[in-house]
Amino acid sequence: MKIIEKKYIKDNENVQGYYSGKYLLYQLGISKVKPKTIEIYSNNETQRSKVVNICGKRLLLHKPRTKIDKFNASVLCFLELMNGIDTETLDEYKRKLISDYIAENRITQRQITKYIPFFPDKTCRNLIESEVIYRVPQ
């Protein structure tokens, strides 16, 4: 995993990507099932998406919606989470896990407002329907 981290997520202090999809759900504890494929958005990917195998791990790599850096990676990751989440399955426990991520990464409404135009309308709809937006500080 260190090779994957260094190549696609973070090389020293240079943040260039983040985990997404079912793997992110697993990392946050929202899903108990460890997926076979690790989904990553990375500046080091130029194609819209492609599958590669590294160190016996299957990766689904995506070109980012906008350039990723240490200042925006956590909010982009959060918005990607909200884009793909099934709001019907969100219970209070899962909302709490998402709230914890928001707090740990100090995500603000101002950051969300800045980056949400890069995401589909579904992302904004999911933020509201899940009521997660009300847990984000101004």
Where does each model-flagged region fall?
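Sequence-level detector for tyrosine residue identity
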Residues: 8, 18-19, 23-26, 41, ...
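A generic structural signal for ordered alpha-helices
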Residues: 2-3, 56, 90
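A short, charged helix-loop
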Residues: 53-63
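Alpha-helix C-capping/helix-to-loop hinge sites
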Residues: 11-12, 85
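Hydrophobic alpha-helical interaction segments
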Residues: 62-138
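Short beta-edge/loop segments at beta->alpha junctions of small alpha/beta modules
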Residues: 1-10
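Short gly/ser-rich loop at a beta-strand->alpha-helix junction or flexible surface loop bordering the NTP-binding
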Residues: 13-54
